[in-house]
Regions:
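Catalytic domains that recognize anionic headgroups
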Residues: 1-151
């Protein structure tokens, strides 16, 4: 992600959108392009880490692999209640992002054009899957798209 940009900043924590908003500076004298890659809505959804189930090394998607292998594994797949809790936690993360986005919009000069989207959706038990890619699943393909100019 750090190629072809005039500047690249990597935050110390992958879920620090508020820190990005604090650091961002708008120069009204010339057009600028910012790409902000947010981690708050990604597993393990650690906005509030209290009692959140966690499987080490999970990235992408998996499907009850321990059940399918017929072998005991140290890490178990999430049960239905844990899956619901993870989904609720992700929703809380999105609500938090929405609040911080208000701060970014307030900080931006008039006539700033915003495009808000995502690179993937997320499965929370649909079809037995948890996570995203490398699968083609309806939930993984669902992404928001909002755009507009601050007036």
């Amino acid at each position: 992600l750090n190629r072809h940009f005039d500047d690249y900043k990597l935050m110390a924590n992958h879920n620090d959108f508020a820190g990005m908003v604090k650091q961002i500076e708008f120069d009204k004298s010339e057009p600028q392009f910012y790409f902000l890659n947010l981690g708050e809505t990604h597993y393990p959804f650690m906005l509030d880490p209290k009692n959140m189930p966690h499987i080490s090394g999970v990235h992408g998607v998996f499907k009850r692999m321990d059940d399918n292998l017929g072998e005991e594994t140290q890490d178990k797949f999430f049960d239905d209640e844990q899956m619901r809790d993870l989904h609720k936690q992700q929703i809380r993360c999105v609500e938090y992002i929405d609040e911080v986005l208000d701060d970014l919009i307030a900080k931006a000069p008039l006539n700033t054009h915003f495009v808000i989207t995502a690179d993937h959706g997320e499965c929370f038990g649909e079809g037995g899957y948890f996570g995203h890619g490398p699968i083609v699943h309806e939930k993984v393909l669902e992404v928001p798209f909002l755009e507009g100019r601050k007036r």
